[in-house]
Amino acid sequence: MRVWIAGAVWCAIATVATAQTYPSKAIRVVVPFAAGSATDTVGRSYTAKFNELLGQAGVIDNRPGANGMIGAEAVAKAAPDGYTLLCGTNSTNAALVSLYRKLPYDQDKDFMPVAFLGSVPLIVAVNNSLPVKTLRDMIALAKSKPGEFLYASASTSQRVSTEMFANMAGIKLTMVPYKSSPHAITDLIAGQVMMFTADLAVTMPQVKAGKIRGL
């Protein structure tokens, strides 16, 4: 099973930078998730081209936490000069405003979209000790243990996609929150959680290494 998350670059509304002078210094790219996450991988690939294309370096600033809200807030409150960008996902760019009663910034007024970078698939992965080979097997196991099936979540995208799947399958899962995908995948391998719906960059190396099972 795969779902997709979209990545895009946003910046605080710029009022100072002009085409004639921009960029005149390094550009900070805030990644609202931990190093090693798919968003981090995409962000680093993107900023690696800054010096070649713009003549200035791009500097990654990882600000994980609160489903991306911490990083998004840092960009919203940065100087609106075009030198601080947000490498966001549908968590930061869309879901947070629906899931939280109040955000520490105005989603519509504090950001300006700059570019769409691409999309990344999420893959349902389980601990190797589980006697399941397919989603059908996993659903049957979860139905036999309602509420006991623990899944990891390190972002809004991961949580929403897993809960949508659970609702469609008619099963009850229990979420275990994590600050980052790398931390969650470590606990999945160790058997602290049973399932993790995570991005390709995090899951596939472990699936190929035989440490977890992709469904």
What are these regions (language model features)?
Residues A14-V16:
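N-terminal signal peptide c-region/cleavage motif recognized by signal peptidases
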Residues K25-A34, G58-V59, T84-C87, M112, ...:
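Short, well-ordered beta-strand elements
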Residues V29-R44, A66, Y151-T156:
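Extracytoplasmic "Venus flytrap"
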Residues G36, V75-A76, T162, L188-I189, ...:
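Hydrophobic residues within well-ordered alpha-helices
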Residues F50, K77-G82, S98-H183:
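Hinge/capping helix and adjacent helix->loop/strand transition within the periplasmic-binding protein
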Residues Q56, A78-C87, K145-F149, I171, ...:
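Alpha-to-beta junction loops
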Residues R63-G71, V120, M175-T186, D199-V202:
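Short helix-initiation/N-cap motifs at beta->coil->alpha
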Residues T92-K102, R159, E163-M168, M195-L215:
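A ligand-binding cleft/hinge motif common to bilobed small-molecule-binding domains
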